[in-house]
Regions:
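Membrane-proximal helix-turn-helix segments that form the acceptor-binding/catalytic region
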Residues: 163, 175, 179-215, 224
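Nucleotide-activated donor-binding/catalytic signature segment of Leloir-type glycosyltransferases, i.e.
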Residues: 301-324
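Aromatic "clamp/platform" in nucleotide-sugar-dependent glycosyltransferases that forms part
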Residues: 344
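Conserved acidic donor-binding segment of nucleotide-sugar-dependent glycosyltransferases
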Residues: 376-377, 381-388, 396-402
């Protein structure tokens, strides 16, 4: 485990002001995150960029078990320095599975203790470096929030994923009721170990959240989920979108729909394929799945194979685009007829905003945070989690150019008006200012 400076660049304007003795115009912030891919990292990228524009100084602290993904939305152009606190993952190749499961419980406790030791040292370092506050990005289950237990500085947690509801049961072994007694007992013993690991993570997660001076969430759904989970109050600070990058390009639209997100079952790409398969072959669009991952970092290769086989069996044309560059993604949004977004209880769903900013209607599941960004009948179509309903919505868009054009225009205008990152940071700074005493000059402008 180590804490070290990765020797990142300093923003030249800030250095020049410090040399000249200019009065400090903004806060000095320690920004802690895990450097994962996905919407939470994009949010960190955009928020840090906007904070740097406004004169705030940000140092990055990457806190994680294992190696971070440093290539996905790096914060380096906008920060002063980057530090990393890392714990190497503990290999667990024991067999049989029940032995590995119970050894995993001991390893989980060992890693929690190791992190606590490092976070005690880090808490002292952060205080010595004179930060105004510590910002911690949180996605359950996340080890980052354990840092609050070792801080004397004010701490702000931004909870991108407030609950583990959509992960529950994914590792549980099942045994039919008519299975032999030994098989049922074996599954129960394994599941007991899995439950203990989950319990350890929940306890540490809740303790860390309770230690924060302020908790922010990205949606009303996340705020409600956090309160339901542990009666913890929070404030909503919604995401935005970079409308200078994600914008209509007026490109021809192919008879194709897009499903976006990591290749994991909770993103429900298979539901999109099944929905498209309900449409007659003559009208059936192709499906493109865009994922921020590369095959080497893909979380669930088995699920990827299942998707490809399902598309083949259902006679749906499927293409998977891995780790597209930003401009490629913008072009992709502009070339498809719709984003079909059906994840399980998505806390927010940043890709829906990106698609709408490009003038692409969103067919979204009426769940979670998606209900708060997609306006049914105005910027897209909301449906229940039903492949037939989703298929009918896709078919409506394919058959009606008038509907596509109307939703497209309204979606782009709506996002440009209501969902820009500048508004996110306005809200963020107001909330931070309510818990930080003596804000520096112009910090809340």
């Amino acid at each position: 485990m180590s804490l070290y400076d990765t020797d990142r660049r300093t923003i030249a304007v800030q250095d020049e002001e410090e040399r000249k003795g200019s009065p400090r115009q903004g806060w000095t912030i320690a920004w802690c995150h895990t450097a994962d891919s996905g919407g939470s990292k994009r949010a960190a990228f955009e928020m840090v960029r906007e904070l740097a524009k406004r004169g705030h100084v940000v140092d990055e602290y990457i806190l994680r078990i294992g190696e971070p993904n440093l290539k996905h939305w790096p914060l380096t152009p906008f920060i002063r320095k980057s530090y990393r606190v890392s714990v190497p993952p503990i290999a667990n190749r024991y067999r049989p599975y029940v032995l590995a499961a119970w050894i995993g419980v001991m390893q989980e406790r060992q890693q929690v203790r190791a992190l606590a030791c490092q976070f005690r040292d880090l808490g002292r370092e952060l205080k010595a470096r004179g930060y105004d506050y510590v910002h911690i990005d949180h996605c359950f289950p996340s080890y980052t929030v354990q840092l609050t237990e070792h801080l004397s500085l004010p701490s702000i947690i931004y909870s991108h994923e407030a609950t583990d509801a959509r992960f529950q049961g994914q590792d549980i072994l099942s045994a039919p009721s008519n299975a032999p007694w030994w098989r049922r007992n074996y599954a129960a013993l394994c599941n007991s170990a899995i439950s203990k690991v989950v319990s350890i993570r929940r306890q540490r997660d809740l303790a860390g959240l309770r230690g924060a001076g302020l908790v922010l969430t990205n949606s009303c759904y996340s705020k409600e989920a956090l309160f339901q989970r542990n009666h913890l109050s929070s404030s909503v600070c919604r995401y935005g979108v970079d409308v200078d990058t994600f914008k209509p390009l007026r490109l021809p639209r192919a008879k194709t729909v897009l499903s976006a997100g990591r290749i994991v079952e909770k993103k429900q790409h298979h539901t999109v394929i099944q929905a498209v398969a309900t449409i007659s072959e003559a009208e059936r669009p192709a499906v493109i799945i865009a994922t921020p991952e590369t095959p080497a970092r893909q979380e669930d290769p088995d699920y990827s194979h299942r998707l490809e086989q399902m598309a083949k069996d259902l006679r749906v044309k499927l293409e998977i685009r891995r780790n597209p560059a930003e401009q490629e993604l913008v072009r992709l949004y502009n070339e498809v007829m719709a984003l079909v977004f059906m994840p399980i209880m998505e806390p927010f769903g940043l890709v829906a905003l990106e698609a709408m900013a490009c003038g692409t209607p969103v067919i979204g599941v009426r769940e979670g945070g998606i209900r708060e960004s997609v306006v049914d009948g105005v910027t897209g179509i909301l449906v229940d989690r039903n492949v037939d309903d989703a298929g009918k919505a896709i078919e409506r868009l394919i058959q009606s150019k008038e509907l596509r054009d109307r939703l497209s225009l309204q979606a782009a205008e709506y996002v440009q008006r209501e969902w820009v990152w500048a508004k996110t940071i306005d809200c963020y700074l107001r909330e931070v200012g309510s818990v930080i005493s003596n804000p520096p000059k112009a910090a809340l402008r």
